[in-house]
Every structure is written in C-alpha cells, then in structure tokens.
Amino acid sequence: MGDEDWEAEINPHMSSYVPIFEKDRYSGENGDNFNRTPASSSEMDDGPSRRDHFMKSGFASGRNFGNRDAGECNKRDNTSTMGGFGVGKSFGNRGFSNSRFEDGDSSGFWRESSNDCEDNPTRNRGFSKRGGYRDGNNSEASGPYRRGGRGSFRGCRGGFGLGSPNNDLDPDECMQRTGGLFGSRRPVLSGTGNGDTSQSRSGSGSERGGYKGLNEEVITGSGKNSWKSEAEGGESSDTQGPKVTYIPPPPPEDEDSIFAHYQTGINFDKYDTILVEVSGHDAPPAILTFEEANLCQTLNNNIAKAGYTKLTPVQKYSIPIILAGRDLMACAQTGSGKTAAFLLPILAHMMHDGITASRFKELQEPECIIVAPTRELVNQIYLEARKFSFGTCVRAVVIYGGTQLGHSIRQIVQGCNILCATPGRLMDIIGKEKIGLKQIKYLVLDEADRMLDMGFGPEMKKLISCPGMPSKEQRQTLMFSATFPEEIQRLAAEFLKSNYLFVAVGQVGGACRDVQQTVLQVGQFSKREKLVEILRNIGDERTMVFVETKKKADFIATFLCQEKISTTSIHGDREQREREQALGDFRFGKCPVLVATSVAARGLDIENVQHVINFDLPSTIDEYVHRIGRTGRCGNTGRAISFFDLESDNHLAQPLVKVLTDAQQDVPAWLEEIAFSTYIPGFSGSTRGNVFASVDTRKGKSTLNTAGFSSSQAPNPVDDESWD
C-alpha cells in the first residue's frame, strides 16, 4: 500500500475527496466522465438491466477481462461503467498499466485526492485483500451478479472474474462462490472476466492468468514490489496492498473482565516435579513464591486478582534472572505460564525505576517492546500486560496488521510504555517516526524460534539495526518459546549478550504430558469421513482442527457445516474482523469446532479446548508440538488425534515416535515400523536416554529440580538427536 495520510486519519475533521460516479451506461467516448454529477437520482438506474452493464462502481464491462488488451472489448462493445476501470490496457495483461495510478483516457483507476484517508468509508472502493474489487457496498447484490466475500471478484486464486450469470454452479466443485459461508477471501471456482468458467492463460482472472491478488507480486516501474504475499500466521507490511479501515473494538474495561483468568487443572501441582536445566554462569537462585520476588504491593494485588497463587517452573527461574538484568533464552512446554514469567519482572523494574513515556509527549519512547508472530497472540499478550499493570502508571499498547494504521498511531500517541506488536506493523510505525527507540530497555521475542527463522528473521535484524535502538549490551533481550532448535540458538547470538542464560524446563521441544496423543493411519481420501466420525463422538466439546492450507481450511469448515456440525475457520487470508469474529465464536461456544492453519498453532490460550485434531500433519515436528499445545494447558488434560498419511507423512515418523515416547504415550506398532525403516540423516535410532530433547549449544550447565532445587554439574553435552 502506498504511503498513508495518517495526519488525515488522526484529524477526523479534515475533508476527504469523495469520487462521484455516473450511471452504469457508457456516456463519453473515452469514459472520462468520472466526476460529472448526474442530473437526477433516477439517472443512475434508468435503462434495462444488461449483462454489458455489470454494476455501478464496478468493472468497465463484464467482458473486459480475459483478453490481453481490455481496451479491445471496450472499443468493440462500446460500453463501460462509471467509477470502475476505464478503457485502455489497465488489466488483462498480467498487471497494471505502467504499474501506477494514472489519469486520462486509459486510466486503470480514478485519481484520488491527496487528503484521502482510511477513515473515509469510500475507501472500500478499491481492491479487496486477495485482489478482488470493492465498491463500497457491504451487502451482496442479488441476481446473477451476486458478489461474494465483501464485494470481491476473483477467480481461483484471487484474480478477477466471475462465473457466468447463466451458468449453474456445481456444488461439488464449488463449495463457496467467493468467500462463501465464512467470508473468506478464497473462492473455489475460477472464471474469466467475460463470464466463462474455463481458465485463461493470459489476461483472465483465473488461476493461470491475470492478476491473482495477494499471491502474485506486481512489479512497479521502479522495480519494487507493490504487493507481496504474506506468510501464513504472520502479516504483511502496511506499505503494501489496499488501505484497511477496520478498527477493532476496545476490550472491556470492567475489573471482572480484566482479571478473568484460566482455571488450573488437576495436574497443575505436578509441575513441581519437572526438571529444570539452567545454562550459563552466575545464574541467580530460583524463587519459590511470589513474595520472594519483592514485587510492589500494587503488582502483588494484581497477581492475586488474576488468580495466581503458585509459581510454575519457568516463572521460578525466569523472574529472578530478569530481575537481575540478565539476558535470557527460556524454553518451556506449552501452557506453562511463559507470558507472566517475563511481564512481571519487567513491570516490577519499570515501576521501581519510573517511566518516561506519557500522553503529554509528542514522541512516544516506550521502555519495552514485545514482538510476537501472530496478531491473535500479540493481542493476548497485551491483555495480560494490561491486567498486571492495572492501577499503575504503566500503559500497554497493542498494534497489529489488518487494522487501520491511524488507529494504531492514535493508541500510541496517548502514551506507550509497553508496546506489543507484530513485526510488520511495528516496522511501519517506526517508519512513520511515531515512536522513538532510544529509551528501549527490554526487547522480548515471544515464540522466538518463529521470530528468528526465515519468516521474520530479516525484520527482526532490521529492528535491532534501527537508528536509536540500543545495542544488545545496553538493553535486556528476552526470548521465550516451547521449541528452540540449535540453528535458532545460533541465530540468537546476534540479539543476546554473550553471557545470556538458557533455561530449559522439562522436555525442551517435547509435548506436554497432559495431552493424550493418538496417531491414526488414515489415507488422504478417508480423512473427511473419519473427521466427521470423531466429531460426532466428541459432541459439543471444544475442538481445533488443523489443516495445512488456507483453501482447505474453508473447504473443511464448509463441509462440516453441511454435516450439521457448527464450525468456523481462521487463517491468514481472512480479514482481521473475520478472524476475531471466528475466535470469539469459538471461544464463547457458538461454534465448538475451529478449523485453522498454523496462524492459530502458537501461543493462543483458549480455555477448555479438549481436543486437537491434526487433519493434516505439519511439515515439522516443532509445529506439531505447538499445535497439540492448544489443549492440556495449565495442568488441564486434553487429547490430540493425528491423521497419518503413508504417502505424505513418512518424514515425520521418526520424530513423531520420539515425541510420543518422551511424553510417555503409546506408540503404534505400524508407526515404529515406518520410523525404523526410514533413514533420516542425523537422527539417532534411540528414542530414550536423554532427559532434554535439545540443550544449550554452549557448555557449562547445571540440572536442577524445581521441587528440591538440588543441582549437579552435567557432563559435557553430547550430540543431540536431531528430530526437528
């Protein structure tokens, strides 16, 4: 997306240019009558409805796409609509005319005023998230020209085009038209611009031609990308794609809602028996109670209101380490309280040392930045920070993609001490110079292994290289995750001081033992039938179903609804409003089944999730561990069922056997046979004998038990079993 006029967004009184559209019939030789006011209201609607007159504020013609030169159809059929695309060669040639906005007879877009902003509702006239077109009307049109999603037109992969108004859609081929039941931006049926349902090879809106929306890069004249695909589970930079107008509703402000907390399960007390490994020199001793942390009274009151009475192992070790000012890499099982482990000591320091940011400062300079890979997770961290800082002078702010940039800026300028952000939106805000980095004392990477891999690693390196960002010697850097592969540990050295401490709680990279794991051998074409069978036996118990692709998430959710199983879906192609609505429906029981991609695999803490079903196994074992960690949290028990396809999942056999064995789960004989008949370089045949699945890559460790705090010097580390 181009540069946004955030000053106009912040000032709602600034006037915005609103383009005026003409009637839907062609009136002008070159279609250059975009701003002429109609003589009467009836002028917009007169004349019979024709296929050539596609819609108001729509495309130039229902036949303008699918040709190499869209102008050919216009010149031949002499028809156009006002407010959409003019004549010329703007589309149908795999891109834009000159890849920029132009005016004149051959303009691909109308020209916009420079003071246009996201707050203007007319900004809905533009491209939808996956390449479709919006005309500012959220309601669907009736009749054969019905629009799907939220006004988007596209083919199989988000391009332009609509099925023929005269063709009947085959329900077996097209479960959803364009967005369908779940409002997703992913249709199934491809179609060219002239109504044909067959694929085109050049200028059509189908999968094999034309503009494919978010999945296709558009190269501008300067050689830079105007649009770029976003990674699943993450977000794209706000400098790309259309402007976003969504403003999320504020969270409830009443004290009961702020301090609503997760109920611990019957196995919570078993945490005391988990072994803890601390690596590094001069590690401070662990604490046993919150009182030993010497926190201020307000913070202790908030801890009590939140229902925290007992420390988890990761909290016992991490809190004193952070209070001592040491850099930390902490690895603990899913659902073990890692968020509180870093928030509490950071807040304690800030309240003791005083804060610098306030709403009276023009440039906000937060003391702490917390970065997480997904929007849902970063919002969850913000709610925890707001809870623990309740009644204090510390103000937490959350910013993430999919929401209006102006809204994010307005939240920051009101005062920001702790900034919770996703990488893309954070870099946009820094680029707008709305925050300063000179006062940063704490940098936290949650789900750090994901933040440092190829998905977000470059953005994180850019962050620590930003002007004003204190060097790693002048700030405290904290990393938390349930999995820390060795290569990620090596990358982390660029962010951490050389004397950082490594805390490994229990089975590093291992699954939570409170989750009962079952692996079923199910072929690809038998999965749907098996899924329905399991869900019918489960009943209304809350269940998450994981699939590998966004398209399949919507397809499976639609299929389950047809089977009378209330289901919703969440994935990276859904608008943020839709993602939040889906999570809300699942969280509050309206839809007991949530079909998700990896966007929901990490960090999400949804109470009372009893089942996780891996409809598709992930590509890595680490992702498997994170997925099944959505259940069995805080000492509660859960169940995970995975469908193992012999044709596509053999590469996971050995690491899966190891995870099952380490978590003391039953291993099917057929899975062991596959595992030990498959050679994976670097993988040891033994699945037992090493207490920790992966260890600190440095030397000098002490293994401790959280119950007795006995320590013993561990021998020099041996080569790990590489199973990630």
UniProtKB/Swiss-Prot annotation:
Stored SUPFAM superfamilies: P-loop containing nucleoside triphosphate hydrolases (SSF52540)
The enzyme's E.C. designation: 3.6.4.13
Region (Disordered): 1-246, 704-724
Modified residues (Phosphoserine): 222, 226, 722
Gene3D superfamilies in the record: P-loop containing nucleotide triphosphate hydrolases (3.40.50.300)
Subunit structure comment from the entry: Found in a mRNP complex, at least composed of TDRD1, TDRD6, TDRD7 and DDX4. Interacts with RANBP9. Interacts with RANBP10. Interacts with PIWIL2 and MAEL. Interacts with BMAL1 and CLOCK. Interacts with Tex19.1 and, probably, Tex19.2. Interacts with RBM46.
Principal EC category: hydrolase
Domain Helicase C-terminal: 530-675
Name of protein: Probable ATP-dependent RNA helicase DDX4
Its biological purpose: ATP-dependent RNA helicase required during spermatogenesis. Required to repress transposable elements and preventing their mobilization, which is essential for the germline integrity. Acts via the piRNA metabolic process, which mediates the repression of transposable elements during meiosis by forming complexes composed of piRNAs and Piwi proteins and governs the methylation and subsequent repression of transposons. Involved in the secondary piRNAs metabolic process, the production of piRNAs in fetal male germ cells through a ping-pong amplification cycle.
Residue window of motif Q motif: 288-316
UniProt record similarity statement: Belongs to the DEAD box helicase family. DDX4/VASA subfamily.
Tissues of expression: Expressed only in ovary and testis. Expressed in migratory primordial germ cells in the region of the gonadal ridge in both sexes.
Residue positions binding ATP: 332-339
Subcellular location: Cytoplasm; Cytoplasm, Perinuclear region
Bias (Basic and acidic residues) ranges: 69-78
Alphabetical keyword list: ATP-binding, Cytoplasm, Developmental protein, Differentiation, Helicase, Hydrolase, Meiosis, Nucleotide-binding, Phosphoprotein, Repeat, RNA-mediated gene silencing, Spermatogenesis
Superkingdom in the source lineage: Eukaryota
One GO molecular-function entry: mRNA binding
Reactions catalysed according to its record: ATP + H2O = ADP + phosphate + H(+)
